[in-house]
């Protein structure tokens, strides 16, 4: 179906067909969806990126899927469709229901993913046993939404399902507000970035497996979250 391989921008939202390959996200949507484009660059090999899709990641619902953290951080909405009952939309945070399970009904398919075009910097980090063609030991995405003074997060491969870290989001956004940093765009204090990382790690529910221990996953998440928040904030300051 040709429409599944198309994308469009309308009123500040990107409608990404479920069959758009990662390679096109990298080439065409790096400005509108920077976090997802970063994640797409880490997927498999060039051959896999030419064929693999966000729709495929959503359908398999693996907690280690690279697309999930940036979808969560950006506030994506999944558009699904049934021939008998029509279309409906599911927020990404409600889409993952268990290990490799999702909210799709038996007669539904994934039609598209709707994401707001980035209003601020986004970052994606991933730890694996090597630098390429690797399943994530843990992954993290961060999105700054300066237009509404909010922070988005996404955690991968460190819980039964991909998940956000709502307490960490509220903490960082609130501290930035209290310190006047949303307005001043001053330097992000290292202590604040570290406290954010600790809250992200606390939101995870990792296990020990052949790829890494639960303790390592928590530690790596705290480090990635601290770094991602700092990188994103520095990007925001440069754009001011």
Regions found by a protein language model. Give the residues of each.
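C-terminal structural segment of proteins
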Residues: 1-240
């Amino acid at each position: 179906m040709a429409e599944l391989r198309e994308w469009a921008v309308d009123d500040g939202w990107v409608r990404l067909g479920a069959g758009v390959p990662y390679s096109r996200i990298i080439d065409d949507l790096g400005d509108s969806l920077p976090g997802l484009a970063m994640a797409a660059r880490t997927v498999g090999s060039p051959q896999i990126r030419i064929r693999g899709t966000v729709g495929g990641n959503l359908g398999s619902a693996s907690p280690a899927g690279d697309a999930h953290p940036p979808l969560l951080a950006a506030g994506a909405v999944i558009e699904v469709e049934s021939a008998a009952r029509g279309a409906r939309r599911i927020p990404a945070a409600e889409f993952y229901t268990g290990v490799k399970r999702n909210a799709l009904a038996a007669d539904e398919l994934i039609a598209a993913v709707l994401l707001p075009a980035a209003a601020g910097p986004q970052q994606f980090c991933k730890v694996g046993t090597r630098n390429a063609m690797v399943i994530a030991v843990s992954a993290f995405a961060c999105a700054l939404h300066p237009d509404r003074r909010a922070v988005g997060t996404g955690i991968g491969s460190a819980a039964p399902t991909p998940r956000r870290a709502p307490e960490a989001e509220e903490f960082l956004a609130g501290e930035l507000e209290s310190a006047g940093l949303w307005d001043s765009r001053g330097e992000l204090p290292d202590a604040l970035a570290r406290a954010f990382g600790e809250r992200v790690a606390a939101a995870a529910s990792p296990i020990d497996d052949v790829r890494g221990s639960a303790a390592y996953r928590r530690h790596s998440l705290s480090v990635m979250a601290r770094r991602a928040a700092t990188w994103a904030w520095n990007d925001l300051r440069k754009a001011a």
